[in-house]
Amino acid sequence: MIKANPKNRAFLMSSPAEQDLERRLELARLSHDDEVLFFRHLLDARVYAHAPISDDYPRTRLIQFKHPAGFYAVPFFTSRSKALFASGPTVRIVQMTGRDLLQGSPGATFMLNPNDGGCVLYPEEVVALLSDGSVARVEILEQGDSAPLVSLEEANPPAWLMPTLMAVYMDMPFVRAAYLLELTPIDGASRFLVAIAVGPEHAERAVRASTTAIQTLCAEAGIYLDMATFNPQEGRPDYLLQRGVERFYGPQLT
């Protein structure tokens, strides 16, 4: 989730609390365990955001920006100096705890330190973090020249798997369809693949929302589950044309 810092920048002197938050952020770039600890700490840490310098609205309204992927996100920062670096003449800096920030804008997408190799928090991840402190682990792999995906002739998933994912996708109008196939087991443990038909601009959110919903359940059940996406405008990939592939959400795609 948290990307490597693309380059070092010089900032104004930070407070000890900001320095500690930055230290935790650097550790989070290297380890998922530290990433979980960082986000839990972030909830009670002081963070900074941008608001319009002139606004008569009774509640503080935060400024959003359009991410290169096409969605809008609320930027927030681990230090005042980083918030200043990204500000402009029409912007004022507001401070609050991470918890107050996330709770105060339900349904919003957030981006931490957007100018400094930060990360995106999608609405589903915000809900999970606020409710139980969970942070899903998502590793993006390119299939490339790896072995082709071969489906077993019949999938036997846990009873909870497809209903849980269907509930996620019902709140995501950009998800067109979803398919399930069972792959060759790994060390005796069942292995499944869920393929989501979704436009490229929403693919990452769909995968991360899915992972957030089922990662703990998969670990408790001792099964492996991978996620894949494909552009519905380009039709189903060849691996979804095999016997044993089950469409469990949305209409059949050509």
Residue spans for each PLM region:
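An interfacial alpha-helical scaffold signature
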Residues: 2-254
